[in-house]
Amino acid sequence: MKKINFIGRYAAFFLIVTFFSGIVTSCTEKDSDIVKPKTITDVILQNSEFSTLREIILANDLSDALRTENLTLFAPNDAAFKNSNITSAKINSMTKDSARAFVFKHIIGQNQTYETLKTQKYSTLVKGDSIIITNRTTDPTTLILNGLANVITKNVNADNGTIQVINKPLVVVK
């Protein structure tokens, strides 16, 4: 009888240790299980509405520039580019500095929601350039950017800022 009792204690101890080690190892988070936040770059690269802007960003090595903190991107969607007769090929045929300036003229270095934007000048990422925001005279709740564009989709949130989708590019391209 003593031999069976001795084996039973070891078996019970083994089961308890196995049970607790199973609990401990199953509760650890793996990096692959964690949902990573999307930056402005990630949103642009994954959203089919921004295929023209995506091509411009990728061709001009701007992915990292849009991963910095506290940005507001006024992003023209594909329809905005099409209605303005601007293609990614036209932008990418510019010098690299001009193409980068085209994108940077759509970005302010502050995270602004639509509700916090005021009628004023906001400096863009291009030194000496700004976006002028005014109200539409017929509808004071509608904001006009540089006298050209309206925000058509408000407050697309990203981990490092906000995207305001606009109906026209803020830069005239010839």
Stretches found by the model and what they are:
Residues 2-13, 21-174:
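Mature, structured domains of secreted/extracytosolic soluble proteins
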